[in-house]
Amino acid sequence: MTGQFRTAVAVEARKLVASHVVRAATLLIVVGIATLTASLAAAAGTGDEQILAKLGDLADEEGWALLVGIAIQITSAAGLLGFGVVMAFVVGREFTDGTISGLFALPISRGTIAAAKVAVVLVWTAVVAICLTGTIVAVGVGGGHGMPDADDVDGLARLFVLTVMSGAVAVPAAWAATLGRGLLPGIAVTIGIIASAQILVVAGAGGWYPAATPALWAIDPANVSIAQLGFVFVVAGIFTIGTVHSWVRLQLDR
């Protein structure tokens, strides 16, 4: 890690921590998913037929298996949406706030700044994953399920990995926000990614689609290979490079 990159990461980290948008997103992702998970699990426990029908195979589960399974299903879409919005915001706000021109005068290259932005959001994603997993544990223990056993811990670990990988899946939002010079293109791409993932999963072709792979693996690890999981990070790396390259080529008159 170069000195310039460390400096850029430190600056972007301070900006991210101070952002009301990021704070709100963190709260909505962690508390929102945990609350919805607890509500659906409680409704399923009462035998609500409509809820049980929506849960599919999870309808036959109970306790920790039901709770973690619901959390995984919700996180697969809601987590990706939240991370995509934050990724688009962190990268796109320089354009919407009109501060992008000032970056041309800094001694740190624009490519380094772009790389730092993506890196900071990915680290934040990992922090959110820890908080979300811990909150689900608290919900389970508080809900009378006792301490999780080995199988339950495995499910919680998959929830954590799914959340982290959802951040990687959201990296294209950074590139879209750069090309579109603002927040909205990044959000639009995120929504498109979620919608396309749903379509391909229904069509049975989601294993090699990076947006769907983490969720499919979290639900049933046997159906997803290591190569398919690794491809998620390859695609994230490609879009990170694309974002950095686009920032390097930015011009003041655009």
Tell me the role of every PLM-derived stretch:
Residues 93, 106, 137-141, 145, ...:
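Transmembrane helix-loop junction
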Residues 29-83, 115-180, 221-226, 230-234:
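Secretory targeting signals
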Residues 2-3, 29, 39-68, 187-254:
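Terminal transmembrane helical anchor/hairpin motif
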Residues 83-87, 100, 135, 172-176, ...:
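Hydrophobic/aromatic residues in alpha-helical transmembrane segments
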Residues 24-28, 116, 189:
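Hydrophobic core positions of alpha-helical segments in small-molecule transporters
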Residues 88-122:
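Helix-loop-helix units of permease transmembrane domains in multi-pass membrane transporters
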Residues 1-31, 178:
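Aromatic- and glycine-rich beta-strand/loop motifs that create alpha-glucan
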